[in-house]
Amino acid sequence: MASKLKTFINLRDYPITLFNQIRSLSSRILTPINQSHYRKRILLANLLQRYGFPPSSLQHFLSRNNHLLNSDLVETEISLGILLSLKIPQKSLVSLISDCPNVLRSEFLRKWRVPLSNCGKHGVVSSSAIKSVLEHSSRIGIGPDKFNECVRVLKSLGFCDSTVSRILSSFPGVLLVNEIEIRRKIEFLVGIGIARDNIERFFHVFPEVLGIGTETRLKPLLDEFMKMGFSKDDVKKEIAREPRVLGLELGELPRCLELINTLKCREVIRVSIISEGAFRAGFEVKLRVDCLCKYGLIRRDAFKVVWKEPRVILYEIEDIEKKIEFLTNRMGFHINCLADVPEYLGVNLQKQIVPRYNVIDYLKLKGGLGCDIGLKGLIKPSMKRFYNLYVMPYPECERIFGKRKENVRVNKRHPAGLWKLMKPPSNLTTKEDVQNMKSFIESLA
């Protein structure tokens, strides 16, 4: 009985072991369909990598665009060859495919190859303009005939090749704007005082104006400027100086000026902000708000940041962008942190932010921090307090932070003894003054 029981146990264990072996083997052997899918994925990845696609982003790109696996690899390679023949730089080519993978359709590119090649050979349009036109047309289904007509109209207006390229690159939506609307826009600009000689410069600086309605946006915007108390000459001067003024939304400039009027800052900063006039100051606020919104802040938080840190209005846009990129890319914070710590944008990047971050990063790697230091703990402390907390206890941080020169003798602003020359002369007490004081004291007694 015991031997029979032993045999039964062995038989019972055997199928389980066999099943486990079969299951592990089947997990390593793909079905023909999955094997073909996996092989095609590898071939497509190798093809894209051969044309300059970075390996680090291939996995994410293919997972978002599974439809590319259903396309013919030969056709995909032909499409990549056509894009390369248009002399699009490798970085722009990768960006175009990542943002708009539909551009790899071979039938689409065959239609566009000849018109774009001809314009590129004659220098009419640049590679950046070709990229923008392809991306825009693949999304909304525009044909080459619209492109040829648009280029013809712009050239007939007397615009040079660089201006045509600039318009197509920054505002490819011009392909849908007809000739009558473009001429109407020119007449509007001439009517507000822009000289015809400056029209081309105007479109080169702000090509997006071609997509703004004359009756629905531009004329009501000018009426709003007049109602705010600005004269026609002031408006003309500001528009000629900065064409992007016409990109303001209705009600946007009053809101920016209201923010300036409610600022709580030192008088020196306020005077610097409005030194070039209220109109210009309001527009500078709009540019800073747009810059913050471009990186992900909602409009309300962007206004809040500018109101709490008015020095942002005085800084160049490039400096603000450098600080934001350092905050998000290097420090790893989210852009929304600026709503809580707007002071970050008001301090010097190289002199304060970078040294402090390097010290905190070093201490974090060495395990010298008991808790996580947020953006507020990094920016809020004064220079002396930060030094005493994080630098002075660790001698190796002196080199990272920059050694404080405590014993350096500070040069005096004025020569010694100057106070004696500036001291006002003392009043001499006469006998008459003494008599008057005695009389006053006696009257009190």
Curated annotation (Swiss-Prot):
GO molecular function: double-stranded DNA binding; RNA binding
Inactivation phenotype: Severe growth and developmental retardation. Dwarf plants with small organs, altered organ structure and nonviable seeds.
One cellular-component annotation, GO: mitochondrion
Record bears the keyword RNA-binding: yes
Cellular localisation: Mitochondrion
Domain of life: Eukaryota
Keywords annotated in UniProt: Mitochondrion, RNA-binding, Transcription, Transcription regulation, Transcription termination, Transit peptide
The keyword Thylakoid is assigned to this record: no
One GO BP annotation of this record: DNA-templated transcription termination
Broad class of where this protein is predominantly found: mitochondrion
Transit peptide start and end: 1-25
Function summary: Transcription termination factor required for mitochondrial NAD2 intron 3 splicing and normal membrane respiratory chain Complex I activity. Essential for normal plant growth and development. Binds to RNA but not to double-stranded DNA.
Family: Belongs to the mTERF family.
Protein name: Transcription termination factor MTERF15, mitochondrial
Gene name of the record: MTERF15
